[in-house]
Amino acid sequence: MPRASVDRIIRKAGAERVSDKASSALALALEEIGLEIARISRELSEHANRKTITDKDVRLGYSQWKRSRV
């Protein structure tokens, strides 16, 4: 994920300045979260006998991931 995108996310959260290490740490966390949501989405598409992951799979995968974290 581009550093500028990660910096922008952190700044949207209210930070005025962002260290390189903070950007790297958030980028790693976002990648791990994205991989988990993608895995769930793949399982949903396979359950529906499809090889293509759709936007609905991703939205449902995110919803399931979010519920599992509560």
Describe each PLM feature range.
Residues M1-V70:
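Terminal helix-to-tail segments of small alpha-helical proteins
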